[in-house]
Amino acid sequence: MLNPNIEIKKWFYTNLASATALVVYDGFAPEGAGNEYIVLTGRTSTQDQGKEGYTNSISITVDIITKNANFGYKRAETISDLVLTAINSDTNITLANGFTASSLSVESVRNLDGLNPLDNVFRVLITYNIIITQI
């Protein structure tokens, strides 16, 4: 049994960077990351053993962060449209290491303000649910 979160993270990283041309970080962004970037966060998975392998229900959150006094949510929502166009229920996921993705769905899309309104941070969180199997 391999950790399915590793392969799904690699797949999302590649596809998000391609769809948005933004820097994608794993877990958190470093100090000075810039004004627009994406963070892959909130990865969870549960596993069921079947007759011929494992089935994993995976959840991953794509956190789109924009910092600018002039844009508000408009730029973050424009980026979220790029993400949702590239990665949606019709997307086929190809993974390595014997994993096969059978389902991809969007659980939620949420706007989130920064902790301090004076920071002018605007975020859109997209949570995906994926079912993958490993034989």
Each language-model region and where it sits:
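Charged, amphipathic alpha-helical segments and their flanking helix caps
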Residues: M1-P30, R43-I135
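A short, hydrophobic beta-strand-centered structural micro-motif
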Residues: G34-T44
